[in-house]
Structures are given as C-alpha cells and as structure tokens.
Amino acid sequence: MPILTIREVCNINHWGIGYYDVDDSGEIIVRPNPSQHNQIVSLQKLTEAVQQKHQARLPVLFCFPQILEHRLRDINRAFQTAREECGYKGGYCLVYPIKVNQHRRVIESLMSSGQPHGLEAGSKAELMAVLAHAGTRQTLIVCNGYKDREYIRFALMGEKLGHQVYLVIEKLSEIQMVLEEAEKLGIKPRLGVRARLASQGSGKWQSSGGEKSKFGLSASQVLQLVDILKQKNRLDCLQLLHFHLGSQLGNIRDVATGVHESARFYVELHKLGVNIRCFDVGGGLGVDYEGNRTQSDCSVNYSLNEYAATVVWGISQACLEHGLPHPTIITESGRGITAHHAVLVANVIGVERYKPRRLDAPSPEAPRVLHSMWETWTDISASREKRSLRSWIHEGQFDLADVHNQYNVGLLSLAQRAWAEQLYLNICHEVGELFNEKHRSHRTIIDELQERFADKLYVNFSLFQSLPDAWGIDQLFPVCPITGLNEPIARRAVLLDITCDSDGTIDHYIDGDGIAGTMPMPDYPEEEPPLLGFFMVGAYQEILGNMHNLFGDTATADVVVGEDGQFTVIDYDEGNTVADMLEYVYQDPKELMKRYREQIEHSDLPASQAMSFLKELEAGLNGYTYLEDE
C-alpha cells in the first residue's frame, strides 16, 4: 500500500477552492484570484517577510482582502448564471451580515470592491457601523434582530439619507413602534417580515431555523401583522419576506425544502394583497471545511452554482405556477464571503514525543504482576502470529490496572509503577506495528493507538481566542503544517494550546476521506517543528474569540498580492498587549506599575537589580500576550 503525502490527505485541493494550494517545494501558497496563476505567495515566505519587516511575533492572522472581493464576484456570478438559465426576471442582491466579521478592514474591503452588495445589521451597534460604511451611494440595508425605538429611528434615518432600508419585523410588538417613529419622521417605512418555517437545516446551527427558532413570526402572527397594517393603511409598506433555515447548511435538499416552504408564504401573502418585492432567503450557504463534499456538519454536498440554481429555481417555479412577479432575491451569505480570507499562522513551542525505552526484566523477587507484564512483552516477539493482537493489549491493560491498585495501597514503589507504565507503552507500540489498516476490524484500535502515540504539539495560540468554534461546538477547521506537504506521512500529532485549560485541544483533523483524532505530519526534527496554518477562520472566529487566561487578539497583517507574485502588507496591527488585556478587566496598568514600584522599594534588592526588575515589569505590560521566546 503506497504511503500517502500530507498534501493528499489534508484535502487542500477541495477546501482551498483555488485560494490555497501546494507548490512544487511542498509549501502552502495563497492565490487570491484562482484564475491568476502567477498571483501567488508562499505562506512560509510571507510569514518570514512580515517577521523581518514588522518584527512580527507569532501567532499572526493573515487576511487577504482580494479573496473577499473574489468571493463577492463568485457569488454574484453564480446567481447571475442561475437567473439567466431560469429566465428569472427579478434582480439579485448579495447582502453581507456584518455579525460574521465586523472588523473595519472586512467591511471596507467589501464596500470598495466595486461589486454590488448590501449590508445587514442585527443590533443597534451594528446598524451604526452599517450606516457609516454605506456612504453616499444608495445601499440596500436589512435590519434584523430585536429592536428598540432608537434602533428603529436610526434605521429610518438611513432611509431618509437615501438608502434602501428594510426593517424586518421579528416580533409583533415591534410594528407599533416602527409606525409611530416613522410618522414622527414623516417617512413611509420599508417593512419586512421574518416567517418562522417548519423546515430547518440539519447540523450544529439547526436551532436558528425551524418552528422553535428564536426569531420570526409564526403563520398566525404573520396574519396578525397583515391585519394590523391593513387597519393602519400601511399594507404597501410590507415589501420583504425573510426566512432563515440555519447557518452552514450541509445538504442541498434542506435548501430546496426551505425555499419551497417560504415560496408558499410568498404566494399566500400576495393573495392577501401584500406586494412582496424582495425575497430574502437569509444565510445558509455553507463552506466545505472538510473538503469531502458530504452533508456532514462541517462540509457541504453542493457547489456554489448548485446552491444558486436551487434558490432561483424554487422561487421561479412558485411564481410561474401562480402567475406572480419575480421578486428581487436576497441572500445573506456571510460565511461564504469571509471564511476563506483569513489564516492564522502559529509556531510550536514544544513537542512531547513517545520514545521506546529498553527495559530490563523484573528481578526474581518482584511482584507477580510485573512478571505477568514481562511475559506479555516477550510473548509478542516469540509468537506474533499465534494469538489475537488485541489480547496482548488487553492483558497489558489488566496488568497495568493491577499495578495502579497495588501502588495505591503501598505494595509497589514509584520506580516499579514507572517501569510498568513504560512497558505497557512498549507493548502497545509494538503491537500497533502489526495491525493492518486494510482490515476493517483493526481500524478502531489503530485510531486509538495513533492517538496514544501521537506527538503532542504545544502551539503558541489560544483556542478560545482564535478558534472558539472548535472549542464551543466541535467545529472542524483545516489545519496543517505550511511546509513539507509533499513529504510522506511519517508521524501523527495532536495540537494543544497554551491556555491553562484542558479544553484547549483540537480533537478533530482532516484525514483524506474521513476525520481522525490525530493530524498527519511529515517527519521533522523534534527541536524544529514546522509552522502551522489554521485555515478558513475568517467567519465568526475573530468576533466570538474570548479572553480566557487574558490571551488577546493576535497580530494581524492585511496582505495584497500582485500579479507578479510580489506582495504588500497594506495594514499591520501588533495585537493586544498585556496592558490592553488587563484594562479589559479594569486593571489599571499605571496602578499596577505603582504597586510593583512599592514592592521593589520595600525589598532588599540591590539598586541595579531593582531598576532592572522595574524595567522588565514595564516591558512585560507593553509586551505581547503570547509566548515570545525564540
């Protein structure tokens, strides 16, 4: 059976969708425009350059605004093609929900891209940002989320400023406030209604859709809303129908089912005299984190073109059947826009690797359990084909449990316990070499042994800050070394962050057609492990990241790549300092320095050492929150 390379099992050809690839030297390259083959940069060389020019300290988050622009073009193009093929006469507007990533660099990159799109806000603070970035050109703005009068007034101000602002009614109590505030401003509001569907997608985010969804109106509440607007002579204000099946939909059938049900709402609202002009299908466009094209939680079984065709065809069929006008289709595809544009590069600060040790046989007077373990060990070499491979491991497990029990009651010494534990590892390692992946019955125990003997890589990052979804909902992200991908798989590894939390580990890794509990790695010197890349972290991760152990935002570099492969760092941020993080929890750095000074003055340190300590403490407050030792 041929030995696979890292490139072959990390699926970069699939999840990278052209933005990320591997060059002939085995380094990961970034290509912001997949059709421009010379517009590439090596992630390793980029990291080295930023470290040299900006004295950047790892970890660094690299962001590629050109990928954002290309994602806009791709999604717009997919819906343009779908509309042409269906003969769809309505328009299309891609709306960016800024909750996915509210960073200024993201919104400004989208607004300056030249690609048509709108913006969505889900809170008062987000609306304030949206109104500012919308600028002087007319922008379609969708206002979701729960609203108070101030939120509503700001939205109506946006309409007065020339934007096309839709206030989506999430609960019935909002409509009265909207009508009252609109009257005060002398403006006719554009209203939308979020319908709560029975349909919902499957996966980690399914609760955001369906009948038990936090948001939206039930069928009876939609009818009540129509009645209220009729009574107020404002039925013509209701122009947008919105629904949401859930984020990261893995199965295209869920998309088709949801569009079909929501199209029925469109038809019925028209029968009630409501002239719906915009059909907002919400989010749901998934990205393939696994690169497997399956309907699992972190993958999708469809392409972007299939998604667009499914949405457009579902709406057009309802319009054709009932002779209704084609509405403008809106999608809120935030994950599809932003996920690929950001990659975190981090260094490994330590490696813990299993090394077989030669052990001497127990002395004749040693306890029986130690002799039993030794007999198992010698039996492996003497009779490999005569017994079940599992039986040797099971016997070792039983004996080791007995060793621990005897140690706990004082019958064995610490040295004897250490000998037994090492011998058990030797037994497992030796037997593990005899298992065959071709035998289905062996696969489970092979996985278990791979996890037991995997290298432990201590990575200079916080899982809670940089990949919170990996911790919170077990989401899988592509992660692999950024060099050596053309080399054969020689080792297995598990990744641990530097927080003081046992949850700070990555448990799932891409492994060809499946998911494994260990990460395939090339051979590498223990004292010089490769840099690691954490990919597709551009959606939600920066915003959801938390301050566990006061690890802060990483350094960030915004990079533009030229057609000749030359790159420019257009913006660089050093990330949070220790002082920044302490201020978040109301620790005043000046007060801390004062207290350091008081302690040093009351100590018996020599003057030179006292001054040195004070300078080091001050430098520590102004330093990076991550480990800085080279």
UniProtKB/Swiss-Prot annotation:
CDD domains: PLPDE_III_ADC (cd06830). Pathway: Amine and polyamine biosynthesis; agmatine biosynthesis; agmatine from L-arginine: step 1/1. InterPro entries: Ala_racemase/Decarboxylase_C, Arg_decarb_HB, Arg_decarbox_C, Arg_decrbxlase, De-COase2_CS, De-COase2_N, De-COase2_pyr-phos_BS, Orn/DAP/Arg_de-COase. The modification N6-(pyridoxal phosphate)lysine is found at K99. Keywords: Decarboxylase, Lyase, Magnesium, Metal-binding, Polyamine biosynthesis, Putrescine biosynthesis, Pyridoxal phosphate, Spermidine biosynthesis. Its EC number is 4.1.1.19. Its cofactor is Mg(2+); pyridoxal 5'-phosphate. GO terms for biological process: arginine catabolic process; putrescine biosynthetic process from arginine; spermidine biosynthetic process. The keyword Ribosomal protein does not apply. Substrate binds at F279, D280, V281, G282, G283, G284, L285, G286, V287, D288, Y289. GO terms for molecular function: arginine decarboxylase activity; metal ion binding. It catalyses: L-arginine + H(+) = agmatine + CO2. It comes from the Bacteria. The keyword Lyase applies. NCBIfam families: PRK05354.1 (NF003763), speA (TIGR01273). HAMAP family: SpeA. Catalyzes the biosynthesis of agmatine from arginine. Belongs to the Orn/Lys/Arg decarboxylase class-II family. SpeA subfamily. This is Biosynthetic arginine decarboxylase. It comes from Neisseria meningitidis serogroup A / serotype 4A (strain DSM 15465 / Z2491). The gene is speA.
